[in-house]
């Protein structure tokens, strides 16, 4: 029997949009929007400090020269995930049956007022491992950064928020969240963060600066997700304009962009992540949001 769940988040944000703009935002015709194929991979224990350490990561020298993680690894993320998920490297506690990678289709569009981002992927087989997050079988999040003010954001995407002393890393403080070194919303050194949680039926809009904050952003209009058979699709709608802690999006500009999926009731570092990419709004980018 085909299981179909429809989960809608962001009701409060949508009501605010209704009050301010007179109508709910209408999603674009996704059949007319080009999809970018991006393979997420299981990263294990590979924090920012590791990718900068030349004795352990051969790409550290290239990183220092200004090359991006995607320049070297975009075609091998699935293979990287296999090595790490198996415990061959960078994972001291491998989970039997853990999916090494998740291929995702990403689509983007805008209507002059709102940005629409759609993610779709097939549900990997369950590992059978203990559930880390009982409430949420799936979570998906993406981050945006503007201007490369966060060190290495232009090269490493969201990796600048991932540190060896953050919770769920070996020997780390369980209370320490993601953060940016020298992070400051006032100085523009932050990531704009969006997340959708399946079980809680909620969308969140926060930021990562000196610590991660899951709420307080004002750009999110709605987050809607559904599972149709073995396929998930999640659509985020956010205003192009933003308040404090939000990245304001402008036509003709590109932004640092990365995303991650917590699958199989996972939590913390046990997610699948993208490399760093560019989101272009009427501009060049790995993912392009054209006006519809």
What kind of feature is each model-predicted range?
Residues 1-24:
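Gram-negative bacterial Sec-dependent N-terminal signal peptides
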Residues 25-56, 70, 78, 141-195, ...:
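Acidic/polar low-complexity flexible segments
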Residues 81-98:
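Short cysteine/histidine-rich metal-coordination sites, predominantly Zn2+-binding motifs
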Residues 113-123, 232-238:
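Short, well-ordered beta-strand segments enriched in hydrophobic/aromatic residues
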Residues 123-130, 244-245:
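Short amphipathic, basic-aromatic surface patches that mediate peripheral association
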Residues 174-226:
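Short helix-loop boundary/capping segments
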Residues 223-230, 246-251:
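Exposed beta-sheet edge/beta-hairpin loop segments within beta-rich domains
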């Amino acid at each position: 029997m085909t299981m179909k769940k429809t989960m809608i988040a962001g009701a409060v944000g949508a009501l605010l949009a209704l009050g301010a703009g007179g109508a709910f935002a209408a999603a674009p015709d996704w059949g007319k929007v080009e999809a970018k194929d991006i393979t997420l991979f299981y990263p294990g224990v590979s924090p920012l400090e590791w990718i900068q350490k030349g004795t352990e990561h051969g790409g550290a020298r290239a990183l220092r020269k200004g090359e991006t993680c995607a320049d070297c690894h975009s075609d091998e993320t699935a293979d990287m995930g296999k090595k790490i998920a198996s415990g061959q490297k960078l994972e001291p506690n491998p989970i039997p049956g853990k999916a090494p990678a998740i291929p995702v289709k990403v689509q983007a569009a805008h209507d002059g007022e709102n940005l629409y981002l759609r993610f779709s992927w097939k549900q990997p087989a369950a590992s059978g491992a203990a559930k880390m997050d009982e409430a949420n079988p799936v979570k998906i999040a993406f981050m945006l950064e503007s201007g490369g003010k966060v060190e290495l954001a232009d090269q490493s995407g969201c990796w600048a928020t991932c540190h060896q002393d953050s919770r769920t890393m070996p020997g780390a403080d369980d209370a320490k969240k993601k953060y940016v070194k020298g992070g400051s919303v006032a100085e523009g050194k932050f990531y704009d963060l969006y997340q959708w949680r399946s079980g809680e039926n909620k969308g969140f809009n926060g930021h990562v600066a000196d610590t991660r904050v899951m709420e307080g952003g004002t750009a999110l209009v709605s987050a809607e997700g559904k599972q149709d058979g073995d396929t998930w699709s999640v659509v985020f709608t956010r205003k192009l304009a933003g308040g404090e802690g939000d990245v304001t999006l402008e036509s003709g500009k590109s932004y640092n962009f990365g995303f991650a999926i917590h699958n199989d009731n996972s939590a913390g570092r046990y997610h699948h992540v993208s490399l760093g990419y560019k989101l272009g709004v009427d501009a060049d980018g790995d993912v392009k949001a054209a006006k519809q």
